[in-house]
Amino acid sequence: MSGLAARDDASAAHALSDPSPAGGAARHAVVLDGISKSFPVRRTWGEMARQPTLRPRAPVLQNVSLAVAEGEFFGLLGPNGAGKTTLFKMLATLVLPDSGTATVGGYDVVGEASKVRSVLAPVIADERSLYWRLTASQNLELFAKLQGMRGAAIGKRVTEVLAIVGLSDTKEKIVAAFSSGMKQRLLIARALVAQPRVLLLDEPTRSLDPISARGFRTFLRDEISGRQGCTVLLATHSADEVLELCTRVAVLDHGRLLATGTTTSLARDLGEERYALYTRDANHPALAALVQRGIVGALAVRGDEDGWSRVEMELAGGMERASQVVAMLGEQGVVIARFERVPLPLADLIDRIVRRSAEGSSNA
């Protein structure tokens, strides 16, 4: 078994006792303990005629255990078909687990589904779920009534949530005239009407342009997670969302939990810490000597700007080792303008975790 796979097993074993990103005691907002789910495999008429009693099933979640602390911004990563959507549906009480338990705010998703729905709200990032011919206020008033609210409480809560998402000035504007970013905010407002403690976000910025997406991420971080104190579970493929928002992430593949932690710690566990050196001496023998001695990995020169070259290298050992490399190069007379860690691209991080897990399984 690989080192990463071993750490994953240990993380799963201790997830329930220590979910906090800092390793300290924390209350749990969401706890999954050995959750598994499979669905029937669709078969052709010919296959059913030949084997009428066969009932094949495809696993979608396989023994997933993790815990999310209250107030945490937690990311779910993985390729399409990894099980993220099924996991969200299970937390929202729309899908029942085959085995294992899941709790939200201390309530079991099977035995206490109504209480779970009172503390959790999924945010459907589909603008078509809004009533475009109604105003923002009318959309929220309708939803509030569906949530069981009555009388003056409706108007008060609608006013509050519109202020939270920054749409107070456009509350009488029909939704059809809203920009995509405004519609996303209205979807958040709709979820906040019932005052949930946990929000489920599924790729909330996928329909936004880069500038609108950046503003929306700021809104999620500062207002929803910061001032409102909501626990947020985010399923995403966006590196910007992960880096700007998530305290920790979990990587899923084919329904299996492969790793949890910060993106930095996961990259370090993979031995894939990469650094960039900006120097005028890209061909200095001291750099080649570091490679020969096995202190750094292969060097890659990435362009030249005004006489300064960017030299990338793999380097294990974290910041302490990096400082030693800088000191050694300085002693050898290498001119250094900047030395910095290069974050591993999110797609590469996920791909390498998946490949490492597959290699560990084949060697087990």
Model regions and ranges:
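Conserved ABC ATPase "signature" region
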Residues: 46-47, 141, 145, 152-170
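Catalytic Walker B motif of ABC-type/P-loop ATPase nucleotide-binding domains
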Residues: 199-203
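Helical segment within the ABC ATPase nucleotide-binding domain
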Residues: 214-228
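ABC ATPase "signature
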Residues: 260-261
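Conserved catalytic motifs of ABC-family nucleotide-binding domains
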Residues: 195
